[in-house]
Amino acid sequence: MKKYKFIWTVKSECGPVRKKNEDSIFPLESGSSKTSIKAGVFDGMGGHKKGEVASDLASKTMHRDFDSITDYVKTANRDILEYQSSNDDAKGMGTTMTVVKISQDGTLSLAHVGDSRCYVLSSRNMIQLTEDENVPGYQNVLTQALGSKEKLTIQNKDFQLSSGDVVFLCTDEIGRAHV
């Protein structure tokens, strides 16, 4: 079995439209590992109350250990809904969530809700693993997000990486503008 070494770089900053950054990322710092890795990007819903709180709550689930990548999404959604129910000023808050777990053998497992994106860049091409969940004709309106409803339809995908492949997670602003 081929073993991989994982190297990651993270960057999050407020774009030109918003006054505050409502995105969260996991892990918080760049690094490397010879074992498996999990990573995620979370885009708090701009224009809604407490989008930054929703994305932060979702990113904090990544500190836990679950067998299934979808359990991170389900738990984050439950945490956000519970926060909303005990904080009147948080009603309507939400976030996207795109998370991956990459095992030692290079198997990438993906769970996704919203319009953040996951790409794999190989020596031959770029593959978008996620599908945007936007209302047709309204690229800024999501059909679902964490915190919007109890039962979410979670996109799942497994993908076998090859040596040298790059996994790129980004929010919709980067995905639409630069990729």
Q: Can you name each region flagged by the protein language model?
A:
Residues 1-176:
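PP2C/PPM-type serine/threonine phosphatase catalytic domain
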